[in-house]
Amino acid sequence: MYTQQDLIQALAQLKRRRLTAYLPSAVGLAAAIAVFVAGRIQRSDSAWVISTVLTILAVGYFLFLYGVSIKPAKTYCVFLQDMLTGRKRETQGVFKSFSADVCDRDGLPCHSLLLNVGQKDDPQDDRQFYWDAQMPNPAIALGAQVKVESNDNRIASMTALE
């Protein structure tokens, strides 16, 4: 389901997002320092206000973009690394349900999936897994025997058994 190419693309996207946050913030902080130094040299009483405003804007811009753009991309990169190189566990059972609703699981958008590993109608044998919402929905019919390869409870691959 996941390939090394997916990880390379995610890391490239993370790099682009970091640049869009770091560069303008660094320019804003450099401008704030330049205004502060120029104000001290000219003994200006109001230069510190401009310097403070520039600093607040630069830091605010960075914090906003970090929370909205960088952190989700970083979380997805860690997720992909876990799926590709992390320890995986195989579980076999009956594919019981797939939720069309998207939920948040460890910062990632996911669909909930239910797999029954024991007696078909015994709810104590149900296992909940999470399917990455960025991947196409599984093309496996409900009630089919499946093999799920997972890291924690996030699905790395799912195949139908005959």
PLM regions: where:
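Short, charged cytosolic
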Residues: 1-6
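Alpha-helical transmembrane spans
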Residues: 7-81
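Short regulatory "switch" loops immediately downstream of catalytic or recognition motifs
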Residues: 35-37, 97-103, 116-119
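Structural detector for short beta-strands of small beta-barrel domains
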Residues: 84-107
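Beta-strand secondary-structure signal
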Residues: 92-94, 112-114, 145-147
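A broad structural signal for short, well-ordered beta-strand segments within beta-sheet-rich domains
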Residues: 95, 119-120, 155-156
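OB-fold (S1/OB) nucleic-acid-binding surfaces
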Residues: 105-129
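A membrane-cytosol interface segment of integral membrane proteins
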Residues: 124-162
